[in-house]
Amino acid sequence: MKKAILLSIVLAGTLFSVKPQSYPKAPGAIRLLTYNTHYCKGGYDPGEINESNVKKLAQVIKALDADVIALQELDSASQSRGIRYLLHEIAIHTGIEYTDVYANAARFDKKGSIGCGALVRKNLPIVSRIIAYLPGDEPRAAIQLELEKFVFIATHSDLNNEKRIQGTKIICNDSREMKKPVFVAGDLNDSFRWSRNSASFPLYQKDFIIASDTVGNTIPGRTNNGALIDFILLSKKGKNKIKIVDSKIVREINIEGKTIDLGEISDHYPVFTDIICK
């Protein structure tokens, strides 16, 4: 009887000591993040375009305390979506002071556009910025941001294999000219796991190492081996100047005491990598 009571106490203590999912940064670390927003429609199609969903995604970014962020599936000035500037709205709702940089890659809804974007915490000054436009059945872009210690490229690769290869070549060629370490972050629509259909990843692997978590998938609900397509890469020539501290594909997170399933927020999970510049 005493053993049973003792076991119950131990189990209860174990249950109550389990911490909600949180991801603290190491002191001095810079957190890089890539997140496909699904236009802030929620985790499913058709989803809903509303401010509530924008706030939910922004709260994930706030909880992760990210410093430099690549965001995909953004829209701007679309009449059917309230003529919103989605990247800026996300930034505002985080409550964090970010500089936002948007690449209007493709026309959408008459006078609107869709594209990718980047958010950079304002205590990390942007030295220079370049937007490179990439081939695609849906036109694509890569935002090249030079910071003090590294270059951050935010992109969203095309679904067309041949055009994805062309876009990857442009990014790789540009990165070779850069003296600082280079990160490429985004939904690459490609994977090192795709033995037959991997069109562009072998090109990246010539110049970059994978700097992000590769355990499991980045698309919620997918159990097949090919659903890991969101990455943060680091240039091989710059890896000696960067220490990778931590990286996670974030599937759930604690926000205000509640555990949030991030499959409800977007159809991609966010991926972060914490770095220290040497």
Residue ranges and their predicted role:
Residues 130, 173-183, 190-278:
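Metal-dependent phosphoester-hydrolase catalytic domains
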Residues 34, 70-71, 154, 185, ...:
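Generic enzyme active-site microenvironment
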Residues 40-46, 130-132, 153-161:
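Surface-exposed cleft-lining segments at the edges of enzyme active sites
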Residues 70-72, 99-104, 183-187, 210-214:
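Active-site neighborhood of phospho(di)ester-bond hydrolases with catalytic His/Asp-centered motifs
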